[in-house]
Regions:
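Anion-binding and metal-coordination hotspots
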Residues: 1-201
Length: 201
């Protein structure tokens, strides 16, 4: 706070926003999380001309150096930090390409990546409405079942997701014969349509 413009914007000095004071506010803010994200989305669109047509979805985790037993959302699970000896929570986050967050969820530390997308997708639609958005994510996050649901939704939900290497090898010969298409400076791709799927190489 004291290293930002917030004091000038609020007309207050840094004493109103000391670290512990802000921490105590978190529980109150949590009750209004969806309303706050909806408000912030509108402000970002107005102030920065931010577009929410492309959403980047990813997962991370944070661990606790505390003694078991684990409780609540603090569970043992796959540790991205190589700390399998610590309990953790999994955090799902969706942001715009500009880096503006549209939502997050804190989940149990033993939550599997491929079980998170369906619920988060519904939550974003319930808060921000249905729209023809493009979701970009790692290939380990969605299941084929969820991708099929996204394609068949009444308002189509598009996605860009990494293709498993085993499947990509099946299209290697067909992709080799495709011409390169330049999408912008120093970026060229090959496109291959297969039914409802468009592969980008």
């Amino acid at each position: 706070f004291d290293h930002s413009a917030m004091a000038d914007l609020l007309g207050e000095d840094f004493k109103i926003a000391q670290k512990d004071t802000l921490y105590r506010c978190h529980d109150r803010l949590l009750e209004h999380k969806e309303e706050l994200f909806k408000h912030l989305k509108g402000r970002w669109e107005t102030l920065f001309d931010a577009r929410c047509e492309v959403l980047l979805y990813d997962l991370t985790s944070t661990y606790f150096e505390s003694d078991p037993p684990f409780e609540g959302k603090r569970q043992f699970g796959y540790s991205r930090d190589k700390r399998s000896d610590c309990v953790q929570v999994v955090i799902a986050l969706v942001v715009t390409p500009e880096g503006f967050p549209l939502g997050y969820e804190v989940m149990a530390g033993n939550t599997a990546d491929n079980t998170t997308l369906r619920g988060f997708l519904k939550k974003i639609e319930s808060v921000h409405g249905k729209a023809e958005r493009v979701w970009v994510m790692d290939r380990g996050i969605p299941t084929e079942e969820v991708l099929a649901e996204m394609r068949s939704a009444s308002t189509p939900v598009y996605y860009l997701v990494g293709t498993p290497k085993g499947r990509l090898s099946r299209y290697e010969e067909a992709l080799t014969g495709q011409p390169w298409a330049r999408v912008r400076e120093e970026v060229s791709v090959k496109l291959l349509q297969d039914g409802e799927e468009l592969y980008v190489y």
